[in-house]
């Protein structure tokens, strides 16, 4: 594998979004165990909201929020992780397409705008009781 420039950026709640905008590829490794079944896939949703293609562990709620090969890749074995990361490194157009697909997924399914009718219905139902 060719050398890829990397930079470690410590997490900072004040600069997180700005820092993420510098990413070209996101990584979301979680252990495939019972504890991880309680995870919410928020990291994957964050990557998608910002338009970052990513590789995530093929486990838990990741199956519900993303499609393998559309917004990013899912991997379980070391070989799958390696192959997925290399594909994203080598294909700028794929990264762009996946980033756009991720952003569209968040806008269509998870945004306030797309969920407003559901919220409104709940509030109207509660208010009428």
Map each language-model feature to its residues.
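Nucleotide-sugar donor-binding loop of glycosyltransferases
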Residues: 29-32, 51, 57-59, 69, ...
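Conserved acidic donor-binding segment of nucleotide-sugar-dependent glycosyltransferases
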Residues: 66-79, 87-93
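Active-site donor-binding acidic/aromatic loop of nucleotide-activated sugar
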Residues: 3-12, 19
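C-terminal alpha-helical cap of glycosyltransferases
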Residues: 112-129
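Short loop/helix-cap segments at secondary-structure boundaries that form the rim of catalytic
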Residues: 1-4, 65-67
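A short, well-ordered alpha-helix in the C-terminal region of glycosyltransferases
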Residues: 94-109, 118-121
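Nucleotide-sugar-dependent
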Residues: 13-46, 56-64
